[in-house]
From Swiss-Prot:
The active site is at residue 224. The keyword Thylakoid does not apply. GO terms for molecular function: metal ion binding; oxidoreductase activity. Component of the heme-dependent oxidative N-demethylase (HODM) enzyme, that catalyzes the NADPH-dependent oxidation of dimethylamine (DMA) to methylamine (MA) and formaldehyde. Functions in bacterial methylated amine catabolism, linking alkylamine oxidation to the tetrahydrofolate C1 pool. The alpha subunit of HODM binds heme, oxygen and DMA, and serves as the site of the oxidative N-demethylase activity. Keywords: Heme, Iron, Metal-binding, NADP, Oxidoreductase. Dimethylamine binds at residue 266. It comes from Ectopseudomonas mendocina (strain ymp) (Pseudomonas mendocina). This is Heme-dependent oxidative N-demethylase alpha subunit. The heme-dependent oxidative N-demethylase (HODM) is a heterotetramer composed of a catalytic alpha subunit, a FMN/2Fe-2S-dependent oxidoreductase beta subunit, a gamma subunit with putative aminotransferase activity, and a delta subunit of unknown function. It comes from the Bacteria. Traditionally, PAS domains are known for signal transduction, sensing various stimuli. Ortmayer et al. reveal that PAS domains can also support enzymatic activity. The alpha subunit of HODM contains a heme-binding PAS-scaffold that serves as the site of the oxidative N-demethylase activity. Its EC number is 1.14.13.238.
Length: 338
């Protein structure tokens, strides 16, 4: 698949973000059934379906340049969105190495990496970056290594320290979260940062997930899909910016639901870092408006059924309740059996 980047689009203010027909076709629709309930739903992150979001371990798409501009803007306003605790320095270099290696291998027309021992040469042709540096020496980069590489990667990243039979969120770059804060969750254990999720704890979902994640081996990453809904194509729906987007849920009407409401899907990747034994948790976000989504009749029909029958506690947690009935009524026309 030839990768072409779209001209600069915005994820705020005028919200000029749109998906091309090709981007719609490869959107990772997250519902395999007409009903949704929490599950671990992890699978090996092996390459499949050429051209899809599952072809490469770290997906780069047409929105790359726009997303990197959005990340830079968020960091300019709030540098604390990137955090690395002192004991995570090796894991930060580990992350840089993994991301550079994958980008250069999977997208050689846009990224290049050459190495001679610790002397590395990185070229990001998409963003016009040409950097020679010494691996392991932070003074040879313009900023801390985790920040440096994640300023060039779509999606958020948490780097989890594994100790005492648990995982701790001790580093990360989070500028496009679905209503959570790295600043707040920093240092928390796996169950602590998942504590707001309703129903799943009683079902044992997180006990099973933690046991699985602790045993992930180097070279055997796993992935899963997660989802929510977002009003407008806004990437930064963080608690820190709630004053900018919190009221948007009250603006949904029968006339604008297709334009305003976006299905927000996270392709979550968990990969063991070889030098530090930390776990890299990638959260790659995809947005699609309902107007775009219903161009696929099967998706439109299924989304109607999922939203109609979604358990109330899950709808509340995902922030859907306020406009849920408007959404279901609008989607009903796309379900022949409704």
């Amino acid at each position: 698949m030839t990768l072409t980047f779209k001209p600069l689009e915005s994820y705020r203010e005028d919200f000029s973000f749109r998906n091309s027909p090709a981007a719609i076709a490869r959107f990772p629709f997250p519902f395999p059934e007409d009903q949704y309930m929490y599950s671990v739903n992890l699978e090996p992150a092996v390459s499949r379906d050429p051209g899809s979001v599952f072809e490469h371990q770290f997906d780069v798409d047409e929105h790359y340049v726009s997303e990197m501009a959005e990340r830079a803007r968020v960091l300019e306003l709030d540098p604390g969105r990137c955090l690395v605790m002192p004991h995570m320095a090796q894991a930060a270099w580990d992350t840089l190495a993994m991301l550079m290696e994958h980008l250069a291998r999977d997208y050689p027309q846009h990224f290049r990496l050459t190495r001679q021992g610790d002397a590395w040469h990185w070229q990001n042709l998409a963003l016009g970056i040409d950097q020679r540096f010494t691996f392991g020496d932070p003074a040879s980069l313009p900023c801390e290594p985790l920040e440096y590489i994640t300023r060039q990667m779509q999606g958020d990243f948490a780097v989890l320290d594994q100790r005492d039979g648990d995982l701790f969120m001790d580093a990360g770059m989070v500028t496009c979260p679905a209503d959570w804060s790295l600043r707040f969750d920093a240092g928390m254990s796996f169950k602590q940062w998942h504590s707001p999720v309703p129903m799943a704890h009683q079902m044992g979902v997180f006990d099973r997930a933690l046991k699985y994640l602790l045993n992930i081996q180097v070279g055997a990453p796993v992935r899963r899909l997660n989802w929510t809904l977002t009003i407008n194509p806004r990437l930064d729906t963080s608690p820190e910016t709630y004053h900018e987007w919190g009221n948007d849920r009250g603006k949904v009407t029968p006339d604008n639901v297709g334009r305003l409401v976006h299905l927000r899907v996270e392709l979550q990747l968990m990969a063991r870092l070889p030098r530090s034994n930390a776990l890299l948790f990638g959260i790659r976000t995809y947005l699609i408006s309902l107007d775009e989504l219903v161009s696929n009749p099967a998706w439109a029909q299924r989304l109607h059924r999922v939203m109609r029958d979604l358990p109330d506690p899950i709808a509340d947690y995902k922030g859907i309740t306020r406009y849920r009935q408007t959404l279901v009524d609008w989607l009903r026309r796309f379900d022949p059996e409704a």
